């Protein structure tokens, strides 16, 4: 068994789509980044990479490489799955928290869990996604950005 932790933060800006867990969320701002800036999927990928001692996602998918410009983060998550699978591991479980003041995410969480479970070839029971606010404190509370944290347990596959 291996444990990994991931964290990602992106700034909210106008004229960008807000994508979390592969779900487009109606909002007046989106997250700024080289890819689609999906902080939830980025935190999950970092957790998996950490558990496998691969470094962070910037090492695997550098923002200096134009082939990752505006890429769908689910494509990258599937690549991380392939690496994990090739190394002989599978998802035990993932627990993630998204921190933002707005928008409210409750109605989108089930679809996020489904997307992530599909890309990681696991059951949705193994994928937890929660959302919270910072009670209007800090940059999340001022609606300047969104943070996601994730922890994962990977199990060695039975051969």
Swiss-Prot record:
GO biological process: isopentenyl diphosphate biosynthetic process, methylerythritol 4-phosphate pathway; terpenoid biosynthetic process
Site features described as Transition state stabilizer, chain residue numbers: 34, 133
PROSITE patterns noted in UniProt: ISPF (PS01350)
Protein residues bound to 4-CDP-2-C-methyl-D-erythritol 2-phosphate: 8-10, 34-35, 56-58, 61-65, 132-135, 139, 142
Cofactor: a divalent metal cation
Residues annotated as binding a divalent metal cation: 8, 10, 42
Recorded catalytic activity of this chain's protein: 4-CDP-2-C-methyl-D-erythritol 2-phosphate = 2-C-methyl-D-erythritol 2,4-cyclic diphosphate + CMP
Pfam families: YgbB (PF02542)
Pathway recorded for this protein: Isoprenoid biosynthesis; isopentenyl diphosphate biosynthesis via DXP pathway; isopentenyl diphosphate from 1-deoxy-D-xylulose 5-phosphate: step 4/6
Keyword line: Isoprene biosynthesis, Lyase, Metal-binding
InterPro entries membership: MECDP_synthase (IPR003526), MECDP_synthase_CS (IPR020555), MECDP_synthase_sf (IPR036571)
MF terms in GO: 2-C-methyl-D-erythritol 2,4-cyclodiphosphate synthase activity; metal ion binding
EC number(s) reported in the record: 4.6.1.12
Bound cofactor: record note: Binds 1 divalent metal cation per subunit.
Family: Belongs to the IspF family.
Subunit structure: Homotrimer.
NCBIfam families listed in its UniProt record: ispF
HAMAP family registered for this protein in UniProt: IspF
Function, in words: Involved in the biosynthesis of isopentenyl diphosphate (IPP) and dimethylallyl diphosphate (DMAPP), two major building blocks of isoprenoid compounds. Catalyzes the conversion of 4-diphosphocytidyl-2-C-methyl-D-erythritol 2-phosphate (CDP-ME2P) to 2-C-methyl-D-erythritol 2,4-cyclodiphosphate (ME-CPP) with a corresponding release of cytidine 5-monophosphate (CMP).
Name of the protein in its database record: 2-C-methyl-D-erythritol 2,4-cyclodiphosphate synthase
Gene from which this protein is expressed: ispF
């Amino acid at each position: 068994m291996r444990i990994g932790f991931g964290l990602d933060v992106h700034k909210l800006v106008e004229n960008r789509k807000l994508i979390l867990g592969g779900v487009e969320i109606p909002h007046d701002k989106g997250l700024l980044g080289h890819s689609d800036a999906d902080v939830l999927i980025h935190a999950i990928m970092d957790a998996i990479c950490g558990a496998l001692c691969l470094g962070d996602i910037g090492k695997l998918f550098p923002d200096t490489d134009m082939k990752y410009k505006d890429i769908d983060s689910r494509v990258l998550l599937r690549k991380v799955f392939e690496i994990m699978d090739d190394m002989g591991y599978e998802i035990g479980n993932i627990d993630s928290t998204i921190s933002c003041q707005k928008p409210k995410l409750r109605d989108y969480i089930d679809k996020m869990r489904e997307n992530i479970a599909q890309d990681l070839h696991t059951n949705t029971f193994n994928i937890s996604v929660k959302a919270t606010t910072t009670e209007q404190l800090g940059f999340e509370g001022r609606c300047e950005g969104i943070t996601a944290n994730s922890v994962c347990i990977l199990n060695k596959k039975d051969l």
